[in-house]
């Protein structure tokens, strides 16, 4: 490996919306610089999880070091730091941008700028990164690079005269991109003599070596013999090894300011080496940590229950192991009268929730029932105290509480303007408050709304895509809590409260939601040999009810003609048995019923 001086190091990342070709471009850069031999190449080389490849998204960050000989004959070290493009993982993105001096903005030459790209570009501009626009997929028949250049200039305000046209699929334009990184991205600050500070921009759990931490040295130097201090968690470690990603790990003795590498120090859990934390030397610690560290706060909560009660310990072990590699996942045990033992889990967003659920089912072979997602409500009690509620079933009684506040988000939706009406209708249905509308170009519009987060976490994204035939994209950020007239809607099945089906809804919507929910459950719960009443209630008031009629078992089938009193006796015996069955009978609620709470908005229920 070449030990390049700071002036010949370039740290950059790639910003792109899902599907705009970021991982493919990263593959080409690795191939063109000879970092990965052609025979070892596989698509989406830096996306290590099968789940990432299948969904075509980047979840965990990766990094790769490339050696590149520029047109001036000098050899440069290019560190590519891969970033996730999804809104749920925006904190990880902001940390990886802090580790760079430049960014390639990859825009699909046929689709144009999308919402999440924009959010990440603004983060990049906040971090003073040099942004190089790249128009990808110009080999597609629908590509229109000139229109997209205008769009980028209009929306982001970037000068696109020297935007690089490329096709990551065929490799066209890739050498120009590498040269542009050398020419236009500034080298890191020469801070070798300052106290050592390194930024953690990612970490993952290795079952044999503990947590492997990816970091960028901001100032000073780190050698493999050092003892280090993590400034936010206040933990100290003796280093086992440090090295570089090329893209496979290679040990080195020392890394200095400007370089990107990894370290292993027998760290037990990812939570001990949080993204955004600062590494410094124990012998000569820095005075203050690097700015911008915050702990990931879960936004969306749901209950996870095993379908078989004896799988509960397996689920607990699986969550323990998953938390080692996913510090944003929070969970605590929960019991439910309908479902038995399980866990209440907190996630960054809906995508994060789906991914965790899928990883639990796939990697740990579990069969799970997932309750409808909810958000954290702030309940102001009559005695002046404040209670945070993440499980609708635990909402305090109306007599004890004064008001309920729910989290609101500022939502920006980008779409072609013919879908304007459909999107405004959707936001209105979801209790959205109209803020602004801007025309970006003659045929694309930005809608800005403020909405309750609870209305977004169910199926807002799916509905938005459905109503715009997949053309709209959205981006949201939290703006705080607001008071609303909210009530707890309980569902009673056969007289018993099914706590896993409890939701918190707006008072004006309660009747419609309750009515739609009981009707939906009627379709989904299998018939029994006794009548099952299904009711929706607010407090002690039943607002909607229906019932599933019993299956009639013909006890008279064996009586051919004969005495009427014999038949009466059999029918009486059956009625008695049904009465006992109704009193004792437990109704099994299938998984689809719990998801019914989510799908209500499709059927026009709310």
From Swiss-Prot:
Keywords: Cell inner membrane, Cell membrane, GTP-binding, Hydrolase, Membrane, Nucleotide-binding, Protein biosynthesis. Its main location: membrane. Disulfide bonds: none annotated. SUPFAM superfamilies: EF-G C-terminal domain-like, P-loop containing nucleoside triphosphate hydrolases, Translation proteins. It comes from Parasynechococcus marenigrum (strain WH8102). Its EC number is 3.6.5.n1. Belongs to the TRAFAC class translation factor GTPase superfamily. Classic translation factor GTPase family. LepA subfamily. It is found in: Cell inner membrane. CDD domains: EF4_II, EF4_III, LepA, lepA_C. GO terms for biological process: positive regulation of translation; translation. It catalyses: GTP + H2O = GDP + phosphate + H(+). PANTHER family: TRANSLATION FACTOR GUF1 HOMOLOG, CHLOROPLASTIC, TRANSLATION FACTOR GUF1-RELATED. GO terms for cellular component: plasma membrane. This is Elongation factor 4. One of its GO terms (molecular function) is GTP binding. Required for accurate and efficient protein synthesis under certain stress conditions. May act as a fidelity factor of the translation reaction, by catalyzing a one-codon backward translocation of tRNAs on improperly translocated ribosomes. Back-translocation proceeds from a post-translocation (POST) complex to a pre-translocation (PRE) complex, thus giving elongation factor G a second chance to translocate the tRNAs correctly. Binds to ribosomes in a GTP-dependent manner.
